[in-house]
Design a protein with these regions (language model features):
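Second-shell loop/turn segments in exported
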Residues: 73-77, 114-122, 157-160
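Amphipathic, membrane-active segments
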Residues: 81-112
Length: 219
């Protein structure tokens, strides 16, 4: 698990890049600034989400200490139900699936719509989808967000582990740039370790290449 730490310089860059969406009223980072090349710079300024391992307990403590209230009791299920409904509404026909697992919501982002082959930079055409995700994450901020990258079995295990980590980091960097608290996030790459389909077919390999985002309630 890794955190991003935003420096004063990074914060200035992000503030200068922020615009207000006229349709939603939400602030987001300018698409122009997040275009080819400059998108990577803003992502780096927002924090690389690299290497700092921390416990779930520590993440929760950081958020509660910053004034974010924890969910409790019967309100948890309703809160996550409402978040699920918003995610399904905003992500309809996007290619991203929404699955409810207990009190958590899981997003599956297939790599073919998120990244070019063997690349870890988010496709510009996927920015709008991530903006929609960020808007829901802003509204339902009493949640923790785990971003995990996965690959198929082609190539070496070391390469796949690194690629999956870089892809997960790219998605998390983009989302934290949309004024989301980095303390909510963890990032991990699991390479080819957790396939959801056979790697014996092209179709199965395509399903295995993905980034999954698990959103769990802050309790």
């Amino acid at each position: 698990m890794k955190f991003a730490i935003v420096s004063a310089t990074a914060a200035a860059l992000l503030l200068s890049a922020c615009t207000t969406n006229p349709y939603t009223g939400e602030q987001q980072v300018s698409k122009g600034l997040l275009g080819a090349g400059t998108g990577a710079a803003v992502g780096a300024a927002a924090g690389a989400l690299l290497g700092h391992t921390t416990s779930l307990k520590t993440r929760k403590a950081a958020l509660v200490g910053a004034g974010l209230g924890a969910l409790a009791g019967g309100g948890i299920g309703m809160y996550m139900d409402n978040q699920e409904a918003k995610l399904r509404q905003r992500l309809a026909n996007s290619g991203v699936s929404v699955t409810r697992v207990g009190d958590s919501n899981v997003l599956n982002m297939p790599s073919n719509i998120t990244f070019d082959s063997d690349r870890s930079d988010v496709k510009p055409g996927f920015y709008d989808t991530l903006n929609s995700v960020a808007i829901v994450f802003q509204e339902y901020n009493q949640t923790l967000i785990d971003v995990v990258g996965h690959t198929d079995s082609d190539g070496s295990a070391d390469y796949n582990g690194d690629l999956s980590r870089r892809r997960a980091s790219s998605v998390a960097r983009y989302l934290t740039a949309q004024q989301l608290d980095p303390n909510r996030f963890s990032v991990e790459g699991r390479g080819e370790e957790e396939p959801i389909a056979t790697n014996a077919s092209a179709e199965g390999k395509a399903r295995n290449r993905r980034v999954e985002i698990t959103i769990q309630p802050l309790t």
